[in-house]
């Protein structure tokens, strides 16, 4: 699943080809995604794009009339291609702009979404989202206060978008390992020092992943078709039974919240 670094990579890749250009039309081949493609998007024509931003794992295309909200789902990707490019089986949406290019959305599992809103402040999917992990709002004191009375496994807590957005499975695993904290530790038992370490590590891991163009494990490609290279730097994620890069012991895995979790039992003691 594309996580925050992958979505940020996509945003940076597509922005130069879309910002300040005009949407000529939107071609929708498969309107039934996770949610049906918004009718306003299907009929959108001759509208200027004024900006592109990101909120959590959502791409936001700002136009003169409203906002296109895109989510890549489990296997989606976006890329910029010439308007005469051949269409692949899973190319479901084209946003055609007046520079000879188009934004093409590909999604084999069709679990993404492309929606429309005229008011971001009232957009229902954004109302309960926590702070951005790279923002000043996400800090040690915030995490400490948010974790009090939370008898939840720490990894599950960090992946809760109401706590902080965009810390997905890969980056939660990596951050906890670097900090030496067991993924099953109860959130309420975090110390202030651990919160300080976790916040700084999460920010550092995400920034490094963005620089590397995200993590390619299966479906994700950058907008230019290249893979993300952060997978080459993963310390524990996907490395079950391999030696721990810190102590040489064996990396173990377990299921937490229906997601695979990877950790070193020697370096990440539960408590």
Curated annotation (Swiss-Prot):
Cofactor: record remark: Binds 1 zinc ion per subunit.
A single GO molecular function term of this UniProt record: class I DNA-(apurinic or apyrimidinic site) endonuclease activity
SMART domains assigned: Fapy_DNA_glyco, H2TH
Record-annotated active site: 2 (schiff-base intermediate with dna), 3 (proton donor), 57 (proton donor), 259 (proton donor)
UniProtKB keywords: DNA damage, DNA repair, DNA-binding, Glycosidase, Hydrolase, Lyase, Metal-binding, Multifunctional enzyme, Zinc, Zinc-finger
Coiled-coil portions: none
Pfam families: Fapy_DNA_glyco, H2TH, zf-FPG_IleRS
Named cofactor requirement(s): Zn(2+)
Chain positions of all zinc fingers (FPG-type): 235-269
GO terms classed as biological process: base-excision repair
Catalytic activity: Hydrolysis of DNA containing ring-opened 7-methylguanine residues, releasing 2,6-diamino-4-hydroxy-5-(N-methyl)formamidopyrimidine; 2'-deoxyribonucleotide-(2'-deoxyribose 5'-phosphate)-2'-deoxyribonucleotide-DNA = a 3'-end 2'-deoxyribonucleotide-(2,3-dehydro-2,3-deoxyribose 5'-phosphate)-DNA + a 5'-end 5'-phospho-2'-deoxyribonucleoside-DNA + H(+)
CDD domains: EcFpg-like_N
Enzyme Commission (EC) number: 3.2.2.23, 4.2.99.18
Keyword Cytoplasm (UniProt): no
InterPro entries to which the protein is assigned, alphabetical: DNA_glyclase/AP_lyase_DNA-bd (IPR015886), DNA_glyclase_Znf_dom_DNA_BS (IPR015887), Formamido-pyr_DNA_Glyclase (IPR020629), FPG_cat (IPR012319), MutM-like_N-ter (IPR035937), Ribosomal_uS13-like_H2TH (IPR010979), Znf_DNA_glyclase/AP_lyase (IPR000214), Znf_FPG/IleRS (IPR010663)
Its biological purpose: Involved in base excision repair of DNA damaged by oxidation or by mutagenic agents. Acts as a DNA glycosylase that recognizes and removes damaged bases. Has a preference for oxidized purines, such as 7,8-dihydro-8-oxoguanine (8-oxoG). Has AP (apurinic/apyrimidinic) lyase activity and introduces nicks in the DNA strand. Cleaves the DNA backbone by beta-delta elimination to generate a single-strand break at the site of the removed base with both 3'- and 5'-phosphates.
Sequence similarity: Belongs to the FPG family.
PANTHER family associated with the record: FORMAMIDOPYRIMIDINE-DNA GLYCOSYLASE
Quaternary structure note: Monomer.
Protein name: Formamidopyrimidine-DNA glycosylase
Species in which this protein is naturally found: Haemophilus influenzae (strain 86-028NP)
Classification of source organism: Bacteria, Pseudomonadati, Pseudomonadota, Gammaproteobacteria, Pasteurellales
